[in-house]
Amino acid sequence: MQNRLTIKDIARLSGVGKSTVSRVLNNESGVSQLTRERVEAVMNQHGFSPSRSARAMRGQSDKVVAIIVTRLDSLSENLAVQTMLPAFYEQGYDPIMMESQFSPQLVAEHLGVLKRRNIDGVVLFGFTGITEEMLAHWQSSLVLLARDAKGFASVCYDDEGAIKILMQRLYDQGHRNISYLGVPHSDVTTGKRRHEAYLAFCKAHKLHPVAALPGLAMKQGYENVAKVITPETTALLCATDTLALGASKYLQEQRIDTLQLASVGNTPLMKFLHPEIVTVDPGYAEAGRQAACQLIAQVTGRSEPQQIIIPATLS
């Protein structure tokens, strides 16, 4: 059986010093791109990751997990992270934060760095474009949040249920001309599932659907709300709080105050600025807690990967 390679071995095979290998492992500056690529190629060729004892000697915690968010400024993801952190701290784990910016390539790079650092596990906020092959190494030590993948642990929101709750509330209030502002179907959860839930409710209750799917940004809500407002429209359902905030700004500027807004999110900013908007809480805080607890249970051998659905509740 082949002996495990050490940092000294990687340095020798790469033709560099041990300190250079250490800087590459920790993704630190001070290493040329050419040298970094040469060291990484050697590590990948030999499947190298530092031992826990080596990490401890470098002053690193023996219990480290990573949280990869899509955007550091995401209101919903921050609500989930706020409940993850105490759960990890309580069990002695040091969390590190990374950002994917909805880039599968960045996720792959982050996972490569984390693999080389031999961390304990990862919570990954999922999005369209992440493949199961990309995650293969992490099957027993990763939890996906807001997306699911076969064979992997996941914590997902009930997207269809959230829309159904809001549509039912608006319908019960007497609204029969309910428009929809959402996200393209390339986003499977926030986009496709929520829009299809809106269409299904309209079909079941014989309502005429009027929808636009511009994207996630507040500005897109602002710029596209006029496309879904007809003279008959009495209510507007937005797939996210950010879209609702953009739509609300447009309606205020146009002095339209008879339209009932509804949205999925219930973030603190929305509740403070627009308490009149009907919202559902998808369970961001609970999802964060569940994701942290599931990951800890997996890496300590107390649980196999499980798929968890967080129910939405009317705020």
Curated annotation (Swiss-Prot):
PROSITE patterns reported for this sequence: HTH_LACI_1, HTH_LACI_2
Explain what the UniProt record notes about the effect of disrupting the gene for this protein.
Cells lacking this gene are constitutive in the expression of the treBC operon.
Q: Give the InterPro entries listed for this entry.
A: HTH_LacI, LacI/GalR-like_sensor, Lambda_DNA-bd_dom_sf, Peripla_BP_I, Trehalos_R_gpbac
Q: Does the keyword Repeat apply?
A: no
Q: Does the keyword Metal-binding apply?
A: no
Report the record's Gene Ontology biological process terms: negative regulation of DNA-templated transcription; regulation of DNA-templated transcription; trehalose metabolic process
UniProt cross-references to NCBIfam families, sorted A to Z: trehalos_R_Ecol
DNA-binding stretch(es), residue numbering of this chain: 7-26
GO molecular function: any one? transcription cis-regulatory region binding
Put simply, this protein is called HTH-type transcriptional regulator TreR
Which gene is transcribed and translated to give this protein? Answer: treR
Subunit structure of this chain's protein = Homodimer.
Q: Which Pfam families match?
A: LacI, Peripla_BP_3
Q: Report the source organism.
A: Escherichia coli (strain K12)
Coiled-coil ranges from the UniProt annotation:
none
Residues bound to alpha,alpha-trehalose 6-phosphate: 71-77, 126, 147, 187-190, 194, 242, 284
Which segments constitute the HTH lacI-type domain? 5-59
Task: Tell me the function of this protein.
Answer: Repressor of the treBC operon. It is able to bind trehalose-6-phosphate and trehalose.
In the induction comment, the record states: Probably induced by trehalose-6-phosphate.
